[in-house]
Amino acid sequence: MEFSSRAAELTTLLESRMTNFYTNFQVDEIGRVVSVGDGIARVYGLNEIQAGEMVEFASGVKGIALNLENENVGIVVFGSDTAIKEGDLVKRTGSIVDVPAGKAMLGRVVDALGVPIDGRGALSDHERRRVEVKAPGIIERKSVHEPMQTGLKAVDSLVPIGRGQRELIIGDRQTGKTAIAIDTILNQKQMNSRATSESETLYCVYVAIGQKRSTVAQLVQILSEANALEYSILVAATASDPAPLQFLAPYSGCAMGEYFRDNGMHALIIYDDLSKQAVAYRQMSLLLRRPPGREAFPGDVFYLHSRLLERAAKRSDQTGAGSLTALPVIETQAGDVSAYIPTNVISITDGQICLETELFYRGIRPAINVGLSVSRVGSAAQLKAMKQACGSLKLELAQYREVAAFAQFGSDLDAATQALLNRGARLTEVLKQPQYAPLPIEKQILVIYAAVNGFCDRMPLDKIPQYERDILTTIKPELLQSLKGGLTSERKIELEKFLKEKAKNYTL
């Protein structure tokens, strides 16, 4: 009896020990580094790994599995590969790449993995979102119908942008592409201060890809001085960061913007610029020995950008009515918009703002080529009052460009042609705008209405900026605010009387 009771005790003890043993038991799938170099590691042994899964090297550096082959796995390293040696252990994390998202991110500067780099400590309350997700389906979307104002007269009047649109900013280096993007962020300050509900507020995400660190620091300073950092998130993968981080940064920024889109809020995301992301992806693909195609880019470089930009959308009322607006930037070489990456992104987006070096050096800033710039869906989102004010603006500018080319030959011009040249020069002058000085929409309507209706026709060109400042500062505030509601016949009479009176002081 004594023996059997002791046996029972022993059995119970063994069972409890074994139960506790298995609760602390963890299985990790590991592999070994076969070769490493140029930020690419070939790893043998990770047979169950998923595409896009994060792995961790023995040195603590992380990487992402991009090539799944029979013999080994091609892993791109997020960081320096100098500490990784042949034969090192590599551990699966079991998770696809994800980043932090939420309102806790506002006002912060983070890297492509969402790690803060602004020296202000760890992130507070946030959720995590996968960087690669499917874009919203057709049924979940709604057509673009709400305006997303940039504060730039040339853009809001001629190439209007709506919430949920993708509008490309394209041009050579040093033509003011980033300036348009920054002005758009700064313009949201006054828009957000007037917002009465969450659905009117627009949050901004700026993704810097392959830029100098000094440029990013300068941008942070500009935004903080204008108090625009409080509604903005900056994602920076600078020129000194490895190519995999430059490739990943736009997707990380997009995941952060999608938090607002999917929670019934509105966000704007700027990718500055996608040319550098394509170059980083080409570098990675060639090192992974993927077959090169046109301009040595891999065959799926179109999909690289299309799957990113399709995530910008206006959601239907049933799915929260949120939106994500995208302003991708592409840098051209010597104005060649027919190169591989520019044509790809032009075909994906809903329109483009084309900037030209020649216009920039002639002092026309923003240097927008009105003939080549187009917004395919934005006119549905443009305010009725702005449509009324613009009237024949685009047509007159097109006729002016056509006639100006012939006028250079110095032949005698008839009165109608002379009037057309005169009007075109003044319209061009009115559309000029200094950097970091976005205008509210009602002020834009006032200035454009004055120019289109001929109140500037008899003024010297150098007097127009002065006239513009004068009418903006002396107009009755109630008349100015009423312009947003549309130009009724009574308002037109009052407005024209005011503009005519002011124009007398500046005419020849």
Curated annotation (Swiss-Prot):
GO terms for molecular function: ADP binding; ATP binding; proton-transporting ATP synthase activity, rotational mechanism. The keyword DNA damage does not apply. SUPFAM superfamilies: C-terminal domain of alpha and beta subunits of F1 ATP synthase (SSF47917), N-terminal domain of alpha and beta subunits of F1 ATP synthase (SSF50615), P-loop containing nucleoside triphosphate hydrolases (SSF52540). ATP binds at residues 171-178. The record marks 373 as: Required for activity. It comes from the Eukaryota. GO terms for cellular component: mitochondrial inner membrane; proton-transporting ATP synthase complex. Its main location: mitochondrion. Keywords: ATP synthesis, ATP-binding, CF(1), Hydrogen ion transport, Ion transport, Membrane, Mitochondrion, Mitochondrion inner membrane, Nucleotide-binding, Transport. It is found in: Mitochondrion; Mitochondrion inner membrane. Transmembrane segments: none annotated. F-type ATPases have 2 components, CF(1) - the catalytic core - and CF(0) - the membrane proton channel. CF(1) has five subunits: alpha(3), beta(3), gamma(1), delta(1), epsilon(1). CF(0) has three main subunits: a, b and c. Belongs to the ATPase alpha/beta chains family. Mitochondrial membrane ATP synthase (F(1)F(0) ATP synthase or Complex V) produces ATP from ADP in the presence of a proton gradient across the membrane which is generated by electron transport complexes of the respiratory chain. F-type ATPases consist of two structural domains, F(1) - containing the extramembraneous catalytic core, and F(0) - containing the membrane proton channel, linked together by a central stalk and a peripheral stalk. During catalysis, ATP synthesis in the catalytic domain of F(1) is coupled via a rotary mechanism of the central stalk subunits to proton translocation. This is ATP synthase subunit alpha, mitochondrial. It comes from Phaseolus vulgaris. The lineage of its organism: Eukaryota, Viridiplantae, Streptophyta, Embryophyta, Tracheophyta. The gene is ATPA.
